Amino acid sequence: MPQPNINSVHVDAILTNISVAYLQNQDNFIADKVFPVIPVDKKSDKYFTYTKNDWFRDEAQRRAPGTESAGGGYNLSTGSYSADVWAFHKDVDDQTVANADAPLNPLREATEFVTRRLMLRRELQWVSDFFGTGVWADDVTGVSGAPSSGETKQWSDYTSSDPISDLEAAKAEILGNTGMEANTLVLGYDVFKSLKNHPDLVDRIKYTSSQTITTDMLAAMFDIPRVMVAKAVKATNNEGATEAYGFAHGKKALLCHVAPQPGLLTPSAGYTFAWTGVSGGLGATIGTSQFRMESIKSDRVEAEMAFDNKVISADLGYFWNSIVA
């Protein structure tokens, strides 16, 4: 074989401008985007709530000359929050740092690693606290057969389902019970995938657009200001077992009213109270720190955050479970 050849003129080395890691896009996560995040100075505290019915009764009366006006009042109670502290760390030993080839940067990668793990934990906690049955005033389950009370046809049934009517009924339910209009729709990715191909929805835009249906189009079609798609993915296997993955939010949907800006006398389906004490005063932001573990000749990279997801007004939410097959 003639020399030199292709193998003798080059020794394989690590590329310094590329590496491969599966970092989910931060836009996949919605836990800090759906409901207002309230930074709080104390780990636990209370907030005031008003009795809804007191504000809806018609009790004003005609006033005769020389008489007192009709009067009344409202009941006031308190709710409470208690922020759980979540933390995760990775130790980076000195030998690994000293021996790392470019483009590897073990300390920087450790920061990304622990931050993403906490982002996933926050997302899964949001699902547990807000995106399930028994949380909101109205729960509807999607079924493949004939629906009974509390059920509707799954939106993936393109022949029999009517997602537009289902959403209109849900909007009317929230408005009729609270006087507030729904302004946010959260869809699991599988639900969004089914909706954007539903013939009823495609038919509404076929003469005005040839594009694939987007969240903005759904918002306009449903007259709901915000439509959000939850795309976070989680591993469902234990370490060392066969890899398995799934969408964190499942085949579910939530319609709700969210306060655009939290404040006094401002109803909202939910709030997230974020304790600033563990994140450098940054509220929902994940706080990271790096400190020496001399006993194991390593630097520890640690991430920490503290929050409590609270349903504030259950009647401002309408939830669908198993809404697609």
Regions found by a protein language model. Give the residues of each.
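A general structural signal for short secondary-structure junctions and capping/turn motifs
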Residues: 38, 174-179, 183-184, 218-219, ...
